[in-house]
Structures are given as C-alpha cells and as structure tokens.
Swiss-Prot record:
Signal sequence, start to end: none
Comment on bound cofactor: Binds 1 [4Fe-4S] cluster per subunit. The cluster is chelated by three Cys residues, the fourth Fe has a free coordination site that may bind a sulfur atom transferred from the persulfide of IscS.
Designated name of the protein: tRNA-cytidine(32) 2-sulfurtransferase
Function: Catalyzes the ATP-dependent 2-thiolation of cytidine in position 32 of tRNA, to form 2-thiocytidine (s(2)C32). The sulfur atoms are provided by the cysteine/cysteine desulfurase (IscS) system.
Species of origin: Dechloromonas aromatica (strain RCB)
Organism lineage string: Bacteria, Pseudomonadati, Pseudomonadota, Betaproteobacteria, Rhodocyclales
Gene Ontology CC annotation, any one: cytoplasm
Broad EC category: transferase
Residues spanned by motif PP-loop motif: 39-44
Gene: ttcA
Length: 287
C-alpha cells in the first residue's frame, strides 16, 4: 500500500526532528554501532523507522541492530517482532529472559512492579549491547516523556531533573541516546497508526502506568487543551536554563557573588515577569 501524502509529510517532518536532535546532541558518529531497543510499542517502532531512514542518507556510516527483550510475560506474542524485523531487513537480536517470574516472586501482589522490572531490563540491555559490540543504545522516549519526567521530579521528588537526550551508563561502557527527543507523542501516534505497525500491548504484565506519571500526563493534556503549546514551551525551557536565577549553590556561586559578578539576564529583582499572552485564556473565562 502506498502511503498517503499526509503520512509522507508526517514521516518527513519526524525524520527532520529526529535528525536535528541527533545533530544537536551529537548522538550518532561515524563507525557507531547502535542497539535500537524495540518493545513493540508505537514509540520504539517509530524510532527504528526514523533511524533506518536517516541511515540511508546520513553523512556518517553507522550500524543498526534492533533488539527485543522477551520477558516471558503471559500472552506475549513472541512471533510478531522477529517477523517484522525480517520483513524490513534489519539485523536483530531477540533476547529471552524470564524477568516476569523474578518480579512476581520478589514483589508482593498489589505492589507496583515497574521499578524492579526496569532495573532487570536495563541490565540485560547493557549486557546485550556489550555482547554485540554496540557502543550506543537508542531508546524511544520522546519530548512528552521528557517533560512528564521533569514534572514528576519537580512535584514528587523535589528535584529540577528530567530525562536527558543523551547520557553515559553507570559502568561507562555505553552512551544511551533518545533520538525522538524533539518529537511530540501525538505526531508519533499518528505516524504509527498510518504505518499500521503491529503494536504489542504494553500492559501484558497486568501493571498499569505509574499513578503519579498518569496524573502528570492528564495535567499536561489539560494544560495543552486550555493553553495550546504548553508542553513545547516547557521543553524549550529545559533547553534554556539560567542557574543564576534559580537557587542551587552548586550551579551558581551565590556565596561568592560580588558587584563584579556577571549575571545572566541582568537585574530583574523588582520586575514582574513579562509573559506572552498568545493562546492564554483569561482567568475570568476559566472560573
């Protein structure tokens, strides 16, 4: 089936956003071997599609290996991803590890399993990357994930911390990259529907989204309905940090501040912040 013009335009747009993120953060370099983690969800399918497309015309040469971790969850359709990988001609590795039973044994019934499951999964991914000689590990987190994580840490963890587009693993063996950092979840969802990817449900283990993360998601969706562009604005703020106007003494030398210390954005101590009014709804209309 030939993709529609709308889908082609969306693909081109997402490829552009992905390529820009890769360039801005120097995510992929010549000679890299990139392990692409594919769970069977819309995000990881889109990630793989973007990287394969960019590989064809990138000025640098890099190798892609798709990986899926079969955690032996009841009902997991183990044949779907191998068949899909073969149909698109991508080198791949299926890793089988019964982390499902381990988690069920360790975590009491009714308690969230996500934390332990994530740690086990991460260890297996790192080990597989080492076995395959991959120096980069690509994950399918997108812009919305990064913004939601910022608010999770801000509201529930007391930290101004989000999800970075690029990081080094604790053992210093690999660089983890998030090439979809500039892509909105809504665009990814539209693309995945248009491409008719064979989506595998993400709740086979019976666990639901972390309640706090779900609340953040609902909050951001409501904000974007009332004030369009808020998620994009928050993400832009993550790229424009002014340490001198926060309160972290490790990032800015407040103790050593003198009359000669240069301060970003000058003296605004007594000024009300000027906020853009475009897209904002007057308080009287929201009461």
């Amino acid at each position: 089936m030939t993709p529609s013009n709308t889908l082609q335009k969306l693909r081109k747009y997402l490829e552009g956003r992905t390529g820009k993120a890769i360039i801005d953060y120097n995510m992929i370099e010549d000679g890299d071997t990139v392990l692409v983690c594919v769970s069977g969800g819309k995000d990881s399918y889109t990630l793989l599609a973007m990287l394969m497309a960019l590989q064809q015309r990138a000025p640098v040469k890099f190798r892609l290996i798709a990986m899926n971790l079969d955690q032996k969850q009841p009902g997991f359709p183990a044949d779907i991803l191998p068949r899909y990988f073969e149909s698109i001609g991508i080198e791949y590795r299926i890793v089988e590890a019964d982390t499902y039973s381990v988690v069920k044994e360790k975590i009491p019934e009714g308690k969230t399993t996500c934390s332990l499951c994530s740690r086990l999964r991460r260890g297996i991914i790192y080990r597989t990357a080492k076995e395959l000689g991959a120096n980069k590990i690509a994950l399918g987190h997108h812009r919305d994930d990064m913004v939601h994580t910022l608010f999770l840490n801000l509201l529930f963890g007391g930290k101004l911390k989000a999800m970075p587009p690029k990081l080094v693993t604790d053992d210093k063996s690999h660089v983890v990259i998030r090439p979809l950092a500039y892509c909105a979840e809504a665009d990814i969802a539209k693309f995945a529907r248009g491409m008719e990817f064979p989506i595998i449900p993400c709740n086979l283990c019976g666990s639901q989204d972390n309640l706090q993360r779900q609340k953040i998601r609902e909050m951001m969706q409501e904000w974007d309905k009332r004030y369009p562009g808020r998620t994009e604005s928050v993400f832009t703020a993550m790229q424009n940090v002014v340490p001198s106007h926060l309160a972290d003494a490790d990032l800015f030398d407040f103790r050593g501040l003198t009359l000669d210390t240069p301060v970003d954005e000058g003296d605004i101590a007594f000024d009300a912040p000027e906020m853009p009014i475009s897209g904002m709804i007057p308080i009287s209309q929201t009461a």
